[in-house]
Amino acid sequence: MARIAVTGAAGNVGRVTVEALASDHDVTPITHREREGLDSVILDVRDEDALTEAFEGHDIVVHLAANPNPDAAWDSVYEVNIGGTYNVYEAALAADIDRLVFASTNHVHQMYNIADATRPETLAADAEAVGVSDPPRPDSYYGVSKVFGEALGNYYADRHGLEVLNLRIGWLLTADEVREKMDEEESVARYVRAMWLSPGDCEQGMRRAVEASLPDSPLAVNLISANDDRYLSLTETMRAIGYRPRDNSATVVE
């Protein structure tokens, strides 16, 4: 059993993560404000001292706190996604954390196959495969902030020996939400089919992210479901952390 601190625990991925880990680990949810039904440590990721105090005595940090809006303005992502992530890494170092799982995103590579460069959540009809180690091509300030977060984690891994997993998370939706999205224009529906992450696969992926022995650090892998329309590779995720996705958007929308 590990002691795990989860920032951004009230978000969609955060709630799934806390539920997935709570049965086998001692989980400390961390949120920006009180949330109904969630007993959490309340703090602002812009407060490094508060983060350090919250991380003390833990083994692993799962850093999910961020402004996740791909249309967010620069000031918003700068303060939370960039400044806040720096604070999380500094606090993790001060608290002697063993592993940090950083919630990155498919948006670090989305410009490779975007249908409309002004609309991050669209996908071209002729999408080509993008490898995990291909150069970043973010589609938004949000994507830029996650490229920074990955690079920062790589630095802390190489400089300080912190075990770092950059987890490029797709779009967490229920099956019903996926079906609803199919009524939107085709470039959006195509994006959803490619980037879907089911709740069940998200739970499994987050468990593997904290429990698997990493073959290398820093390490970056994708976390989406086994969608027929995906252009991001899951080979590295399966090999590195033993992820075995069970869901496929094609079976949901057929």
Swiss-Prot record:
NAD(+) binds at residues 142, 146. GO terms for molecular function: L-arabinose 1-dehydrogenase (NAD+) activity; L-arabinose 1-dehydrogenase (NADP+) activity; oxidoreductase activity, acting on the CH-OH group of donors, NAD or NADP as acceptor. SUPFAM superfamilies: NAD(P)-binding Rossmann-fold domains (SSF51735). The keyword Glycosyltransferase does not apply. Its EC number is 1.1.1.376. Optimum pH is 8.5. It shows 50% activity at pH values of 6 and 10. The active site is at 142 (proton acceptor). It is an enzyme of class 1 (oxidoreductase). Keywords: Arabinose catabolism, Carbohydrate metabolism, NAD, NADP, Oxidoreductase, Plasmid. Disruption phenotype: Cells lacking this gene lose the ability to grow on L-arabinose but not on D-xylose. Pathway: Carbohydrate degradation; L-arabinose degradation via L-arabinono-1,4-lactone pathway. InterPro entries: Epimerase_deHydtase, NAD(P)-bd_dom_sf. Optimum temperature is 45 degrees Celsius. Pfam families: Epimerase. It catalyses: alpha-L-arabinopyanose + NAD(+) = L-arabinono-1,4-lactone + NADH + H(+); alpha-L-arabinopyanose + NADP(+) = L-arabinono-1,4-lactone + NADPH + H(+). Induction: Transcriptionally up-regulated by both L-arabinose and D-xylose via the pentose-specific regulator XacR. Belongs to the NAD(P)-dependent epimerase/dehydratase family. Homotetramer. L-AraDH initiates the degradation of L-arabinose. Catalyzes the NAD(P)(+)-dependent conversion of L-arabinose to L-arabino-gamma-lactone. It is highly specific for L-arabinose as substrate and can use both NADP(+) and NAD(+) as electron acceptor, with a slight preference for NADP(+). This is L-arabinose 1-dehydrogenase (NAD(P)(+)).
